Structure formats: structure tokens, C-alpha cells
Amino acid sequence: MERECGSKELFSKEELQEISGVHVGDDYVEVMCGCTSHRYGDAVARLKIFSDGELQITCQCTPACLEDKLTPAAFEKHSERETSRNWRNNVWVFIEGDKVPLSKTVLLRYYNKALKNSNVSKVIHRDEFVGCSTCGKERRFRLRSRGECRMHHDAIAEPNWKCCDYPYDKITCEEEEERGSRKVFRGCTRSPSCKGCTSCVCFGCKLCRFSDCNCQTCLDFTTNAKPI
């Protein structure tokens, strides 16, 4: 997904000055974060906040940990927090040396805005996977915007789709696919590990059907809906 690099300041210097580990990128702000398990202690990580509301966490719980691009809910589970499913309060950042839940910071501003907009539209698309025709490995596609939906739509329509066609990163068949424990997290707003419900499975809308596509699915939809 392409973002407008450096298009605006996500947070003011005053809002970030007391937060530990701040790094400001072209299209994101990154901070130190963590989640505490009463049994295993603190799992420390890096949280990236994007202007479109996306939150990505790279875990640093051990030097050998390779978990990255986790959702906060997935990171909460990975840290083996005993009382999970409340990542807004369980995932924290350091502010003036104290652990402060994300819910009590400004860092969820864009996430909450995106969530509010998605609830208004009532069109939620969970992440989907497309398998490589060569190696069989499955690659994740996010379906949050019309452009992302089109990339996924074109990928599943191509019988010879390969890892090298993946639109987000330059990858080959040598790259490992996501672990099964991560695949269950597909972006449902009701339940992080949802297997498919009426809130995250769409059977056709103006976001994921295209008037310039000649597949039967799009043709059936656009004959009964005004194209956008």
C-alpha cells in the first residue's frame, strides 16, 4: 500500500517529547512499546503508527525473535499475556519512565479515526491469502482500500500468480510464509482470531467489485449497482 511520504506531521513534538524511543519516519512514527506477562515478564517491541490508522509491531522479546508486522492483538497474544483481548490497555509505552497503556496516549488517534470511518461505512474486509502457483506458499493481502482490493482481485484471477508478483514487497519463493499462528489474525474488528463472520466477510460491495473487470463476479455485481 502506498502512502504519501512526509505529507504531514502525525504528532506534535510536544505530544511525543516524553515518550521513550521515538523515531519519526517519512510516513510513520515509531516508538518503544511492550506487553507484560505475569509469568514471563515484559516483552519489548517497536510500534509503528501510520496516518491511515495501521499499527505494526516488531517484537524484540529475544534477540532471536523474528516476529514483525504484528497487529497489537497478535503481539499481545505472542507476549503470552494472561488476560488478552484488551490490547489497548495491555500494550504500553514508556512515558517519563512509566508504563502507560496505549489507550491513555495520543498514539491511537489515527487508528480510532480509521475504525470510526470503517464502522460508518459498515464495509469491512478481512485479510486474504493468495497461494503461489510455483511454491504453493500463501501471501497475505490487506483489503482496507479500493486499491488493495483490486490488487487482491487481480491476483486471484491470475492462475499463474507467483511470489515475485506480490505487490507489497519484492519477494521470491525462498521467503518463508507466515506462521500458522499469525495467519489466524486477519483484521476482524470483532475478534482478532475470527474465522469469518458477517463483520469481516464481504460478498460484494463498491470497494471490492470493479466495473472495468470482465469476471463474472464483477459483472453480476455491477449490473445491479452503480459503479464508482
Curated annotation (Swiss-Prot):
InterPro entries linked to this entry: Developmental_reg_ULTRAPETALA (IPR020533), SAND_dom (IPR000770), ULT1/2_SAND (IPR057011), ULT1/2_Znf (IPR057012)
A Pfam match: zf_ULT1
GO molecular function, one term: DNA binding
Disulfide bonds: none
Record keyword Transcription present: yes
Tissue: Expressed in influorescence, pollen and siliques, with a higher expression in influorescence.
Subcellular location field: Cytoplasm; Nucleus
Entry-linked PANTHER family: PROTEIN ULTRAPETALA 1 (PTHR34053), PROTEIN ULTRAPETALA 2 (PTHR34053:SF3)
This protein's name: Protein ULTRAPETALA 2
Gene of this entry: ULT2
